[in-house]
Amino acid sequence: MRILQAIFLISLALPANAQSGATAGDLTGMRPNAGGGPDEITVGIGLLDIAEINDREQVFTVDLYVEVEWQDPRLAIDGDTGGELRTFPIDEIWHPRLTIINNRGLDFLLPEVATVDRQGQVIVRQRLSGPLAVDLDLRKFPFDTQRLPIEIVSYEYSPSEITFSENSQLVTALDELNDDAWSYEALDPESYEYRLREGGRSAAGLTFAVMAEREAAYYIFTLALPMTLILFLAWMAHWLPVDVVPARMGTASATVFSLIAFGVSFRLTLPKIAYLTAADHFVLYSTSLVLISLAVIVVTIRWASTDRKGAAQRLARQARVAFPVLYSLIVLLTFTA
């Protein structure tokens, strides 16, 4: 069952009790324990795969197997009636009206039916595949850790009407997930009250989550290493004779343009966010260092052309020492803060 176009509904259902004369229509709107305490719902999720975490779109793509289970005494039958298990379309029976609120296009891969045993135990099984929204905190990118939630909410029942069992669990073989860019750790499920606005009506909610730690080795080779090579080129300009103007200016100017182009192209891989990531700080500090290096080269060229060649050479020697020291400080400030 799909709610609107963006919301996936995990529907749970209860069949009718033939001996009591109840019909499916009699049971679709009333809770099994109406007038008493809340009905207890058990949710089990098997995380089969996390195919991708998309930083730019802020979604992660999952493959899930879901089981939702609860008890309805109205559906119990004696041992001489019917088969061991009965199957019902979920639209014909009561269910706790569950939806995944961060769904962004999950697909149903199994029939939408409920299975009921003789004791009135109801189980709905479904396999889901598709994207889920996630609010990524990229301040420490690419050395960041993200919480990937699966947020389940009843859009009709409050916490006083249904509760989620402590037996609800997330099961997964984390070492077998296909995404080599991340390492994962499953968290315990948490029940909560969901509200659209402060003081509004509350709905029963249950969150499953996985902590994902980014493997930074890829970014060391694609960001830090190219940036270091560009800065090394800027540093080498200080080793040229101070009166070799074309080579020194050409080298310094090339590093500035290369660094700006590289930083812009790298930033396009991230979403439009209102803060700077650790990688952004690294690019900005490195660009500032290259601009300072260019300014030093301009000064030394100017001095060398106005009978201050000795002072120009001393400044160039100082720059040779200061440049790697400042770059080391940039790395420490950016990635160890």
Please provide the spans of the model-predicted regions.
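Bacterial N-terminal signal peptides
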Residues: 5-15
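Short linear sequence elements within intrinsically disordered, low-complexity coil regions
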Residues: 13, 70, 75, 197-199, ...
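Generic detector of short, well-ordered, non-transmembrane alpha-helical segments enriched
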Residues: 14, 60, 144-145, 254, ...
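Soluble non-transmembrane domains of integral membrane proteins
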Residues: 19-211
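Intrinsically disordered, low-complexity peripheral segments of secretory-pathway and membrane proteins
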Residues: 19-74, 80, 268, 275-337
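A generic membrane alpha-helix/interface feature
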Residues: 67, 81, 115, 153, ...
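Channel- or pocket-lining gating/hinge segments that regulate access to a cavity or pore
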Residues: 206-326
